Amino acid sequence: MLTLIDGNSLLFRAYYGVHSRLTRSDGTPTGAVYGFFNMILPILASANPDDKFVCIFDASRITFRQDIYPQYKMNRSETPADLITQGQMIQSGLMAIGMPVLCVPGVEADDVIATLATKNCTNTNATRIITSDKDLMQLVSDCVYLYDGMKSREIREAQVLEKFGVRPDQVIDVQSLMGDSSDNVPGVPGIGPKKAAELINQFGTLDNLYANLADVKNERIRGLLRDNREMAYISKQLVTLKTDVDLSDLNLAPFVFNTPSALEFIRTNVESNSLATKIEKLFPAEQFSAPAPEFTFPGNACEVPDIPPTPTPQPRREIKCTLITTIDELQNYLTKIDRFLAIDTETTGLNQISDKIVGISLAVNDIDGAYIPIRHRIKSNDLFGSDTTAPNQLTLETVYTYLWPILTNPNILKIGHNLKYDLHIMANEGWDTTKISPIDDTMLLSYILHGALHGHGLDELALKYLGHENIKFSSLFPPKTRDADMHFDQLEIKNAAPYAIEDACICYALYNMMRPELDSDDKLRHLYETCDLPLMPILMQIERNGVLADRNKLNQLSTIFHEQMQKLSDEIWQLSGHEFNIASPKQLGVILFDEMQLPANKKRSTDADSLNELIDTHPIVEKILNWRSIAKLAGTYADALPRQIASDGRIHTTYLQTSTNTGRLSSRDPNLQNIPIKTTLGEEIRKCFIAPPEHTLISVDYSQIQLRLLADIANIKTFRETFISGADIHEQTARKIFNIPTDQPVPREMRRAAKTVNFSIIYGISSFGLASQLGVSRAQAKQIIDSYMAGLPEIGKYIENTKKFATEHACVYTPWGRRIELPEIKNPRLRAYAIRAAINAPIQGFEADLMRRAMVEIANNIIKPNPDKIRMIMQVHDEMVFECRTEYATEFAQKIKSAMENIAQLSVPLVAEYVIAPIWGK
């Protein structure tokens, strides 16, 4: 029998289980490790000698499903640092006992499980999947069953029917309708599990349901299905597990438990006598001492680093907690402040534009904190009653009276963690946060010091720097409380205070450790103080400004997109000969490769790259690609953006300052960075962002910024001369590649080829990739690249020097000193990817540095003196967007252009271009 262990399912169950608080003697959390092995040991002990086992984990959060639906799983919070650490320990422990561990990039662990189970499903082979994940119930068949070890329960067809109300082969269609809030699968709004099962039982399949939509008697349900057809089929793509993951090189041998190695791991790294005793009892060393068969898989992306070294044992940090409920207590605590004050707000929710203060925590050092309760309430037990205000609290007005002089005192540094959020909350209360100064932020300090080496959440940093495990927010509430029901203002003050105070004290302690590290590097400190730190309050103001959105235009666009999708669907169905689900890769593969006999690659893939290779073989391919493009824009923007318009008619995105490796900003709710720039449909989306009456929008961006920075960083003489002279860089490149004399014009197709190479070479494009983009043979593409590199030898030198430095140091630097970490370069399986990233990283990072500093300069010198005339409302890639009174637009556009062009003195000129229009776009 083949047993597939769903590593993620067991890891999360163990992490949140009864042993979750266990630690080693040095304080390292081990509860999840203990729980994981405690669950699997009895299963392994019952195995037959010829049974095979493999444990599968996710390689990363990002998979092909985000290409289908970018919001997929984006509702999930940051993975706790101690969960990541324990996950790594578990993988090491599995290898120690002889268990193969498998991770495949680009897909989820569930897809790997589905592929292995399907391939193993023959008349003689049974597959058992150890999991508690309902998403795997679609795999249940005569030869595949699930096993929940915690409940000692097999899950076969009867149990699936009990759970979903349908057969296993119908589970996918039920999930397509009901969606899944935990994974952000949209489904059909208004249709829950019961109604979904009822519909699928009535019509058999999702396809048959939509083919007979008129037979749905309930008018409301029929309308929901009709209006959300595309979402249903997109959801089906998301919930359908792949069964064709390439595992051709995978070989599994019968499982052999290695007792000596297992005991060494448990005793050294988990320090659990009970687990060691259980292993000795179940797997006596005299019977289980043979080394396990070697397991290798070329595509394996499981990174199993060394177990974290044991730090010097430290006692748990003891924090003095002062609860402030009177003016005298507040005044007494504020007298303790010397030169530094850490501050944190507790709020009514997580909406930074509208939520209010519940309480404020302060810390005058790393072990002396205070909590000021302000708006705690007592929840009414009466369904129709209202909550009452908790006693013994200060009013916000009183707190403001005494705290505001401290916040605005130029001699006291105010320290926060993700301080931008706290400033938003204070602004919601009417506080003028522009006067809060000086400030610093431990999240930004962590980011500039260590970039992508680790996350920058407070809990993770506390564990990393201080060996301290913060109180978990969820632990303040009764077990099994839903996230939506966790309201801080309903907590008893005595329980809320230690949690709030700990955040402020830990922030203070982190500042004491990280700021000296930054101050030891003059170049990095200068970058931080002129770019990263001053940018934070500017981003806060951009978020508060928001951008006006045309709801009617978005709704019209949604209608147009869905009409275009229907028209394309009809054309695609006509070309194929019958209707099918265009959103289904499986059905699409059957249509293209079986029925229409189009050439298929080894994996019979229907992803965008594969279809682009087939675009000249049949007109249906281009129509399918167009349908997908429109479907993505409809689902992500035209349908979604109206729901994100606030009461002021504006969309208030959130800018993330610490989420990319290169220093680029990103955004969420919505993600403005993903709106296509150079497509007609993307332009239509941008037109929905508008100026209010008597105002216009100014959009300013850098021209050919990455090529100009490449010319400067790599010291490319030809590029520098071209940019200084103002000549056409792509035309000049074409002359070099194709040896075109200066007295002859450059043919359009040759300039296009040169432009493609110019913008692709710094991304490490191959001859195969260039051939695909240019529509030429690989031999021709190779000749173009060779000619390009020969004509511009400085680029080859830059690439080789960067590769060498990145390989030796696992990082690269921008000219202004930002360190871009490349930890993947140490992993042989990911090294090629990391090296390609290293080539472009200094350029992309320097572009981010320039943009950050330009935003600071423009905000301070142009926006701040003219708040009634102009304000910044968006930043997207190398573009800034402003809202300006119409009569001043040209004046300010020219000032902004000048500021951007003069932000740095390089060996080539920086050029900025602007557009003035009532809409975002041309």
Describe the predicted segments one by one.
Residues 252-254, 858-914:
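C-terminal structured "cap/appendage" subdomains that terminate the fold
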Residues 228-390, 437, 453, 465, ...:
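Conserved "right-hand" nucleotidyltransferase catalytic core of DNA-directed polymerases
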Residues 486-489, 544, 648, 652-653, ...:
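Conserved catalytic core of nucleic-acid polymerases
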Residues 1-130, 134-156, 231-234, 240-248, ...:
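Noncatalytic, basic helical substrate-engagement surface that gates or grips nucleic-acid strands
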Residues 145, 167-170, 177-237, 247, ...:
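Accessory alpha-helical DNA-binding modules that contact the DNA backbone or grooves
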Residues 3, 7, 13-47, 54, ...:
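Conserved RNase H-like, two-metal-ion catalytic cores of nucleic-acid enzymes
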Residues 71-85, 141-166, 222, 371-394, ...:
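Short alpha-helix plus adjacent loop in nuclease-associated cores
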Residues 518-531, 535, 850, 854-876, ...:
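Active-site palm subdomain of RNA-directed nucleic acid polymerases
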